[in-house]
Amino acid sequence: MAREIAQMNKTTVIKYLEYSRGIDDEIKIKRNIVEDLEMCYDTSAAINYDGMPKGQNHISNPTEKAAMNIPDYVRKEIREYTEEIEQLQKLKCEIVKEVLRLSLKQKQVIMMFYFQDLRWVQIADLLHYSERQCKNIRNEAVERLLVIFQNNKTISNFKIKE
């Protein structure tokens, strides 16, 4: 783990900030995949539930059949996607939490540039600074986030897939 932390630098911090912008979309895609996998093996839609006898453990027969119809490899894949979704949600939460620890100016610049995807001209106009000042504020924020991200286990242990 010490080796991973030593490798974090300003470029890595910027990659995490840029990556965080697309996390919500990635989560949506993975959720859709999970739903599609579950629907492929869900036979309960074609079954009439009224007056159906109950299965073992007080689970209705259709539910029991649907659970048994999912092959182990698909169940494993669903579990892996679900774990990835949880990791992505946790990462996004941690990145936002750490950004919120910055000073007001730094927080505004980072949020506008990396999360809202605004251009330097727009940020400078909104904050009433020059573009150069905004870039300097961003550089200071990235320096501070470098230390903060290194100390955050969730962020420092997460590997961005390229």
Protein language model regions, located:
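DNA-recognition helix of helix-turn-helix
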Residues: 128-150
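Hydrophobic positions on the alpha-helical face of helix-turn-helix-like DNA-binding modules
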Residues: 109-110, 122-125, 134
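Catalytic phosphate/metal-binding cores of nucleic-acid and nucleotide-processing enzymes, i.e., regions
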Residues: 93-97, 118-121, 128-130
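N-terminal interaction/assembly modules
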Residues: 1-98, 151-162
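N-terminal positioning helix adjacent to the helix-turn-helix/winged-helix DNA-binding module
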Residues: 91-94, 102-106, 137
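Short amphipathic alpha helix immediately N-terminal
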Residues: 101-118
